[in-house]
From Swiss-Prot:
E.C. number: 6.1.1.6
Positions with a binding annotation for Mg(2+) 2: 421
Protein name (database record): Lysine--tRNA ligase
Species of provenance: Christiangramia forsetii (strain DSM 17595 / CGMCC 1.15422 / KT0803)
Keyword Zinc-finger applies: no
Cofactor(s) of this protein: Mg(2+)
Binding site for Mg(2+) 1: 414, 421
Keywords linked to the UniProt accession: Aminoacyl-tRNA synthetase, ATP-binding, Cytoplasm, Ligase, Magnesium, Metal-binding, Nucleotide-binding, Protein biosynthesis
Cofactor note: Binds 3 Mg(2+) ions per subunit.
Catalytic activity annotation: tRNA(Lys) + L-lysine + ATP = L-lysyl-tRNA(Lys) + AMP + diphosphate
Protein family per UniProt: Belongs to the class-II aminoacyl-tRNA synthetase family.
Amino acid sequence: MHKKNYMQQLSEQEQIRRDKLTAIRKAGINPYPADLFPVDHTTTGIKENFEEGKNVVIAGRLMSRRIQGKASFAELQDSKGRIQVYFNRDEICTGEDKSKYNDLYKKLLDIGDFIGIEGELFKTQVGEMTVMVKDFHLLSKALRPLPLPKTDKEGNTHDGFNDPEQRYRQRYADLAVNPKVKEIFVKRTKLFNAMRNFFNEREYFEVETPILQSIPGGAAARPFVTHHNALDIPLYLRIANELYLKRLIVGGFDGVYEFSKNFRNEGMDRTHNPEFTAMEIYVAYKDYNWMMEFTEQLLEHCAEAVNGTTDATFGEHKINFKAPYKRLSMTDAIIEYTGFDITGKSEKELYEAAKGMDIEVDDTMGKGKLIDEIFGEKCEGKFIQPTFITDYPKEMSPLCKEHRDNPELTERFELMVCGKEIANAYSELNDPLDQRERFEEQLKLSEKGDDEAMFIDNDFLRSLEYGMPPTSGLGIGMDRLIMFLTNKQSIQEVLFFPQMKPEKKAVELSEEEKEVFKLLKNDSVHELNDIKEQSGLSNKKWDKAVKGLRKHKMIDVFKEGETLNMKIS
């Protein structure tokens, strides 16, 4: 973008800040110094260990101020919180030269600027802990005003930075002005730390496996595809890390886990982002019954670490992560909520049953997919408290061991909370011949048109042929789990930078177009002639402005009876 065009798009406030930046530089002050600033206290540290008269060095954003002549109260925000600071001209400028206060502080600083303060602690007459500023330093000049809320005389807040799309696109501004948002991500880190500590105490080994894979295995999902130029081969972004972790069990590790970034080229909604974080753990010589108890203990531990209690609220639901959790087989769950028994049913019978339940199905779906659709539509949403759904049909679980008591089923469970799956676990299939047959069944589904069927991974099959001990594996969706622990209904609230649709390019308006659009902001529908009269534009300029706004799809012009009206689109 040309500098001239960019400058034309600046708001009045942005232009004023740039003018101040120029004045700061002319005064010989570097608005972006490279020097270390020797911070020795935080806002919360000061409040927790307050000592009258103590000298402190703090730094952060200037968030508010009230200037009263040669004195000013302000508020400084650092990563921990906020504290009141008191600027007094004669405390800061002890000699004849008062320009640091009169010019730099009063005229050239703005809300949002980063400053460093050297000062002394005291309490005001009303008992508020405050820093008396002895000296201050500009550390970074903010050229764009923060979207801070305004508070009226009655204490009501207006113009808060609440629009979700803007908050997600500009998370940096969201974090700066909405302190509660930062709490979500502090809890997210607590969750990861708690889980990692739980595993490490049991001497399980944290590992890293490839994100770029030649075969996207370990889950039924559509992958992102890229191309490696040097090798001239397609590569896929990881959809799961399961097959690599199992290779490590083959290699001799008794327990391995990984927090992995996974990618699925599928739809986005309140619980799905194309890039997400999963945790997978595999433990040798265990089965899915052991893993259920392990999962209960793990989630109880994590809930306590994040919130200090096993109780959690999610929307209208009160849930409790204290072990033990209810257990119900998938067959029994479907019988309970539909009256239909899936046992021994053919693909055609399952298809007809699903159609009879008004479930959208098609000819590409095999038995596993059909059962999954029935359960998802009719049962999944019923499980509010943590519930293990166990013993899935074999067709749904190509990497899972056959059930020890029923060859039609597998030793698998999913943990449901508030109608959503947050964990998935198996007694892992370690028979290489059985595994090859399962992969070949998936290949048939792929040829039938199922774009989520698994690829055949011959190297993984080769690893199984060397022998893998009995193993149980668990996968947990970390984003979804933290949603439940922080009562957030959208996955976008728990990701720093969620995937968004491309941002619409800012429209450059002429002065006449701006004037017309400004007049339309007052109400919903306006008579065209009234707006034309208020604008004071000539017929030629009016026609050009309205034509431009309609071209940009910013306004609608329409007729009601004999009257021409207009409104913002």
